[in-house]
Amino acid sequence: EISCSLVGSEMCIRDSRFTYDTPTVPGNDFYALCEGEHPLCMIFLPGFDHPVSREYITRYLKTLPQLKGARLVCVVRSSAQAVAKATHGSDFPFPVICDGPGVLYGYLGVEQTRGLLSWSFAAQKIYKAARDAGYHYDTKAPQLLPLTLVVGHMGKILFTHSGRSQTDLPEDCAAIREITREVVRTMAEDQRRAHPHCSDETLTLPDLVGWDDLDGSSN
């Protein structure tokens, strides 16, 4: 079951039962995914078979060596079974969360827009290439807009960007790396102002994302 809640004034994805499915492995622990030395970037896309999803997942796969100091998760509005069928059961080098019912999409407010209003020039090129390859789409149907999050310990959301068009999301893994670096840099500056006795060497990612606060261990 996917569930979310608000903690204080900060948004967190929190529920002890929150597990997620990938195309090959069901029931993964979301909070274990959030743990780690590097921040986690979550990118919400339309269904896996959508031309924009295919385009950007392909870009991320091709540029994955540039993803240094960060981690990537793509979320698609498709069932794990549908993605597994489309990929013939192949694994991805980064997690692909399959949220067919759209529980996370609904809670986090992933927006929809009508047809061509969401089409950037880049999106038009993607759709043209897909149409030339035999893909058919309804130009008047609502379209999901992308959402980019940087998530810390226990699902704490550190950064959010709601796309204004279907291609308003990180271009590649180098862009994802720069976003996460900026988030960490900004939080480090805030932490230094709050604790001027700390040096750069004493600040770790748990410090920056407020792990102690979420664990209830700080006074």
How would you name each of these model-derived features?
Residues 1-8, 12-13:
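Single conserved hydrophobic/aromatic residue that forms the stacking wall/gate
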Residues 30-62, 71-75:
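Short active-site neighborhood of thiol/selenol oxidoreductases, capturing the structured segment around
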Residues 14, 21-23, 151:
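Hydrophobic alpha-helical segments, especially N-terminal targeting/anchoring helices
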Residues 99-168:
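Thiol/selenol-based redox catalytic cores and closely related redox-interacting motifs
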